[in-house]
Design a protein with these regions (language model features):
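Residue-level recognition of single "structural anchor" positions
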Residues: 1-351
């Protein structure tokens, strides 16, 4: 009896090991088919005019819209757009990035996948990091600990120190927010690089990442005094003169700060350019918040990287109505709103 291989279901199935990955994504055709089902599982959406429905198969990789005859590929408008790197290499990078508990550096990815240059590996990882932050993601709620901590990194853009021939160490201040679960444990986290610990920096961070009415626990810093006026239940823990050490009373933020520092030193050998630190912090948040997931976030990541840039699509839709419809401004706006609602419903069903 012949063994039948069941095709993976996009957005649901996950290759548990490298052999599974090779069975599923061993060819470019398999990768294209997977991404097409993931992006257009409920029907083709033209990236130019936004028309919904079936499309012509113009070639192996191109689909043509029946309405405007625009040809596009499944990678149009995504992080794969116009890439010369094969899709199977991209998906292999995504699998390796998410399958490793501590992640992977650009040098490690270059070595494992046999990439031609370090820059290619770095660019791939940086594009994945951009996709790890979902616009409009949910804010933290419940009891949330907030504090700041310094992160030590090696700035390779600075001259090498004559003492020990080492790169100069730079300390970057970051804000940390950690959900505290009852009776114990931590929930989701948020991280952000901030220039200083003044109210102008920490209060906007709290407003961006924490729901109003949530309980926010901080140290005795005066920078957080306005939180009660902004609708938060503010609990101040004064460290000065307290018998309880800070790493006990604010265990969540201290634990996360230590994990971030260990991750930077272990995976990236402490070598991160300060200008790109926010992207690395986004990756750590993505990993930490999916630490209990069996797929370590690959399913979420592949969904996001295959999703088109909706803002660009909407702009093209509006231009298309103005240029070819012959409608006046009011009619264009009505048609645009109708098409936008239909597009949003289709994308919501697909993701």
């Amino acid at each position: 009896m012949e063994l039948q291989i069941v095709a993976p279901i996009p957005g649901k199935d996950y290759p548990q090991n490298w052999n599974d990955f090779l069975d599923w994504f061993g060819t470019e055709e398999a990768c294209l088919g997977y991404l097409e089902k993931l992006r257009w599982g409920n029907g083709f959406v033209c990236p130019r005019c936004g028309t919904l429905g079936e499309a012509y198969r113009a070639s192996r990789t191109r689909l043509m819209c029946r309405a405007c005859q625009h040809q596009s590929t499944v990678t149009s408008g995504t992080i794969f757009d116009k890439t010369r790197t094969p899709l199977r290499v991209w998906l292999a990078a995504a699998w390796y990035l998410t399958n490793q508990k501590q992640g992977v550096s650009a040098l490690g990815l270059q070595r494992v996948l046999g990439l031609g240059s370090y820059q290619t590996a770095w660019t791939m990882l940086h594009r994945f990091r951009r996709a790890m932050v979902r616009p409009g993601r949910e804010q933290l709620n419940g009891l949330v600990d907030v504090d700041e901590s310094y992160l030590s990194i090696s700035d390779r853009q600075k001259p090498i120190s004559p003492v020990g021939r080492k790169h100069s160490t730079t300390k970057i201040l970051m804000a940390i927010a950690v959900e505290i679960l009852q009776p114990k444990g931590f929930g989701r986290i948020r991280l952000r690089r901030i220039p200083d610990d003044s109210a102008d920096c920490v209060v906007p961070f709290v407003q961006d990442v924490i729901e109003p009415q949530a309980r926010v626990r901080t140290d005795g810093s005066a920078a957080y005094r306005s939180l009660s006026e902004l609708g938060y239940v503010h609990e101040r823990t004064v460290m000065l003169g307290s018998d309880v050490p800070a790493h006990v009373s604010m265990a969540g933020v201290h634990r996360v700060a230590a994990l971030v520092q260990r991750w930077v030193l272990g995976t990236h050998h402490g070598s991160i350019q300060p200008g790109h630190l926010d992207a690395y912090l986004d990756e750590f948040v993505f990993r930490f918040n999916r630490r209990s997931s069996s797929s370590r976030g690959m399913l979420a990541l592949t969904e996001r990287v295959s999703r088109p840039k909706t803002r660009a699509i909407l702009g093209l839709m509006r231009l298309n109505f103005l240029s070819v419809s012959g409608l006046d401004d009011v009619e264009v706006e009505l048609r645009f709103v109708e098409q936008l609602e239909e597009l949003q419903q289709r994308q919501a069903a697909a993701f």
